[in-house]
Regions:
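C-terminal alpha-helical interaction appendages
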Residues: 1-65
Length: 65
């Protein structure tokens, strides 16, 4: 599994736990997010830690909900 896939997989788990979502809803939230798309395309700030990416994603998902 490449790094991008590992990052996205970890973010799905974090979204699932943070928002108490079922796995498919968490996957959908990450897949539909702007950050998730940027990560998938490698167009994100690579200096950010996984925790920082998760915090940004939490904000984005919370706003979308």
């Amino acid at each position: 599994m490449e790094l991008t896939e590992k990052i996205l997989s970890e973010l799905v788990l974090r979204i699932e736990n943070h928002f108490n979502l079922d796995p498919m809803d968490a996957l959908e939230a990450v897949a539909l997010s702007k950050l998730g798309n940027r990560i998938a395309q490698g167009e994100y700030d690579h200096s950010l830690t996984l925790d920082q990416l998760a915090e940004e994603l939490y904000r984005e998902v919370a706003t979308a909900r």
